[in-house]
Design a protein with these regions (language model features):
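Generic structural motif recognizing short loop/turn segments at the entrances and edges of beta-strands
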Residues: 14, 26, 148, 178-180
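Alpha-helical transmembrane anchor segments
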Residues: 81-173
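Structured inter-helical modules in multipass membrane proteins
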Residues: 1-89
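Acidic, Ser/Thr-rich low-complexity segments on the non-lumenal side of membrane proteins
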Residues: 1-11, 158-185
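Short coil/turn segments at secondary-structure boundaries
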Residues: 16-22, 152-154, 174-175
Length: 185
């Protein structure tokens, strides 16, 4: 699920990761869908339903697992909304103009109190506000591959390693380090 979600958010091809993790017939079925990540959730739901019908899962365990699949569906929906909802141009424009206007008028507001220190304080405060404006633009798409984007490869690798370790499947894949400057703490 996590690898497929990563590919969906980055608009890349999930085939290689799916083939590495799943049997070929499942990969073919998943890739035939227009929404592979949703298909994975559906298949997982079908699988736990079959286990329940076969008596291999209790009703309580089935209910808990079904709730977890619902939570994953909510995560998927939230990530899709973040990835596909653009910041309105008017919002970006008003934010930039407000920051520039504030930085332009700031020295006039400070000169009465700070006198000769006004340029230094104004530059420092203006730099901070202009940096926040630039940072907001940089973080608009957190799922990409730019330096300040989320390290999805490292996050998916951590999830995969944890699941394989919990189920006793060894050897574990090599640990991926976070992408670029982002640290997982």
């Amino acid at each position: 699920f996590s690898w497929s979600l990563k590919h969906q958010l980055r608009k890349t091809d999930p085939t290689a990761d799916l083939r590495r993790l799943l049997p070929e017939e499942r990969v073919t079925e998943i890739l035939a869908s227009s929404m592979p990540t949703n298909r994975i959730l559906l298949l997982a739901g079908n699988e736990i339903g079959q286990l329940r019908e076969a008596g291999k899962l209790s009703d309580i365990t089935y209910g808990l697992m079904d709730n977890k699949l619902d939570e994953l569906a909510h995560v998927l929906g939230g990530c899709e909304r973040l990835a596909t909802t653009p910041v309105p141009f008017a919002y970006t424009l008003i934010l930039q103009r407000t920051v520039y206007l504030f930085c332009t008028l700031l020295p006039f507001a400070l000169v009465g109190d700070l006198h000769y220190m006004t340029p230094f304080v104004s530059v420092f405060i203006s730099y901070t506000f202009l940096s926040w404006d630039s940072l907001a633009e940089e973080l608009e798409d957190p799922f990409g591959t730019a330096a300040n984007d989320l390290p999805l490869n490292a996050m998916c690798n951590t999830i995969e390693r944890n699941l394989l370790d919990m189920t006793g499947q060894h050897p574990l894949p090599e640990t991926l380090r976070p992408d670029r400057y982002f640290n997982l703490t």
